[in-house]
């Protein structure tokens, strides 16, 4: 089925191109004798480039399809590539040793977007799923069971959708007649509620799908936990490089690196000399794709790369308040309802 928004099974899959590859390699400085962790293996673009540059790699992905697809690469570069299934927030347990570099490409992969049966994209008719790890609560569970007020928080805070309340109320009314089963079911309702003009730059369902996906996979919480884990794993001089695709992710990374690259705030009850020293050097200038890359890979247009070098000072305290992002706590607060 093809809806008026352009989603449908006949859409042509986009090529799986690693975003900002040259810039990521320049930041990470891969070389023989270095051990780098790729926290989001996906189709293996970063991992292959790191291996070809001489580095050894530990690659992680929570998607079993990505792990299965990476086995030929692991065989090609054995024993220099270790491929493990898991969340990137679990990198400490998986790596088990200190690292020279860490790269994270945050969010859903092109591979997942292009598989209709995974239910990530309103452009491809499929089950309303969105689970990166293919287990746990699905997007359909959330849409069909959560109260309108909770759905509005998900769409508004995580999707940054200004019509969140109207959409949530329409969902609550619509599911009383027929449950939402497919990506098309939801995308068509959103389009009916808020409309779609030819001049709109994005499909009206874009932000609703973003909010649902982030909630189902606890993407912001995963990112925050991964940043804390990364500073504990990196050797002095090691590089953290993070590619983000929307403002919430980028804000979390930006605030983390800002907080960790200056004298860290301590309790007012402690003496001034007890203030912790910077965990990272001043972050490198953020990078976005150029016109040539976005022309070849339109999905790269919203990408941002932020990177910083680890100092020799001890890792800081794991305090989620330093991010100052209310959306970070939505999944934690509503998560019990999804179980």
Swiss-Prot record:
Record's keyword annotation contains Plastid: no
Signal peptide bounds: none
Listed Pfam families: Methyltransf_5 (PF01795)
Give the Basic residues compositional bias ranges: 301-312
- Keyword terms: Cytoplasm, Methyltransferase, rRNA processing, S-adenosyl-L-methionine, Transferase
Q: Where is this region: Disordered?
A: 263-312
Subcellular localization(s) per the UniProt record: Cytoplasm
Which GO terms of the cellular component aspect does the record hold? Answer: cytoplasm
Which superkingdom heads the taxonomic lineage of this protein's source? Bacteria
SUPFAM superfamilies, sorted: Putative methyltransferase TM0872, insert domain (SSF81799), S-adenosyl-L-methionine-dependent methyltransferases (SSF53335)
Q: Which reaction does it catalyse?
A: cytidine(1402) in 16S rRNA + S-adenosyl-L-methionine = N(4)-methylcytidine(1402) in 16S rRNA + S-adenosyl-L-homocysteine + H(+)
User: What InterPro entries would the database entry show?
Assistant: RsmH, SAM-dep_MeTrfase_MraW_recog, SAM-dependent_MTases_sf
A GO molecular function term, named singly, is: rRNA (cytosine-N4-)-methyltransferase activity
Q: Binding residues for S-adenosyl-L-methionine, per the UniProt record?
A: 44-46, 61, 88, 105, 112
What does the record give as EC number? 2.1.1.199
Sorted alphabetically, the Gene Ontology BP terms of this entry are: rRNA base methylation
Query: Which HAMAP family does the entry link to?
Result: 16SrRNA_methyltr_H
Task: Read off the NCBIfam families from this record.
Answer: 16S rRNA (cytosine(1402)-N(4))-methyltransferase RsmH (TIGR00006)
Family as reported in the entry's similarity comment: Belongs to the methyltransferase superfamily. RsmH family.
Question: What is its biological role?
Answer: Specifically methylates the N4 position of cytidine in position 1402 (C1402) of 16S rRNA.
Q: What is this protein called?
A: Ribosomal RNA small subunit methyltransferase H
